[in-house]
Every structure is written in C-alpha cells, then in structure tokens.
Amino acid sequence: FIVQWVLLAVLAIVVVALARQIGVLQLRLAPLGALEVDDEGPPLGEAPEARSASTRDGSTVVVGGPGPGRLLAFVSGSCPICEQVLPSLPAAAGASRLELQVVSDPELETAYRIPGVPFVVVFDRLGVVRSKGTVNSLEQVEGLVDSARRRAAEAEEVRAG
C-alpha cells in the first residue's frame, strides 16, 4: 500500500515536470515577427514609382504612388503557405484601413527585389514603404502593419516638428 502512494507521488512529480517542459517549449516556439531584411524588398522610407502589376485573377492594378495606405501582398498560385495566409489578409488590411492589393507578378517581384512569397509591403498614403517582410501567419502581417503605422507616425512628427 505504501509503495503505491510512493509511485503515485513520483508520477505526480513527473507530470508536473512534463507540464513545465511543455510550457517552456511553447514559449520557444511562439510565432516570430515577420522577417524584415534591409536588402530584400523595396527600401524602407522610399517611395517607389507607380507600376502596373498583375493580380492573381489576371486583372491589372497600379502599385505604389500616392493614394490610400496599402498592404501589398506578393503571392504565387503554387505556394501552400500563400494559400494559408491569403484568407487573413483582408482582415489585417481592413482593421488598419489599408487598401489590399494581392499580386502575382514576376516582373514586379524582380523590380521590388522580392526574395520569395508570401511577401508583404505596407505603403503609407504618400506611397512610402513603411514596412516589409516575408510572412507566414496573420500575427506576422499584423506586426508589419503595426510597424508601418508607428513609422508613419514618426515620419509625420519629423515633418511637423
């Protein structure tokens, strides 16, 4: 009878230790922010000239230039991660009052130095690139939008002050 109680106590200690390890692993594997690399994508703080680009459905949109703030997403039809990210893009753009543009245009990817897809670029109302990065989750897209909003506000303060 005493042996059973000892085994039960040992089992309880093992369960608590495993639960702690699972928590540590979850913290280590938490989603990371979007990867912003300086030499990938259009330069931050610059306004690339407006260009025509093909969307996924074959229509043409104008990318860049002054206008409403924009969330530009580069995707490919053969990209499974793109298919996972696409449904969350309208919500991320709409929550920040950004116009969503989803393009699949190899020429624009080359001109903008896009390293791979899915890649997101956030423009302010002046057409200036405020954030950019490779994404694979809604959290990363939201992080880029937040960074863009913060950088645009800082730029406004500099212009005003």
Predicted regions and their residues:
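Short active-site neighborhood of thiol/selenol oxidoreductases, capturing the structured segment around
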Residues: T60-L89, V141
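Catalytic cores of nucleotide-enabled group-transfer and carboxylate-activating enzymes in metabolic
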Residues: D57, L89-A92, V120
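N-terminal "domain-start" segment that seeds a small globular fold
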Residues: L27-G64
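Non-catalytic interaction/Regulatory regions outside core domains
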Residues: G67-G69, Q84, A153-G161
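Structural alpha/beta surface segment adjacent to cysteine/selenocysteine redox centers
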Residues: E99, E109-F119, R125-L126, S131
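Non-catalytic, surface beta->alpha helical segment in thiol-disulfide oxidoreductase systems
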Residues: V121-R159
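Thiol-based oxidoreductase modules, predominantly thioredoxin-like and allied folds used
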Residues: A91, A95-L108
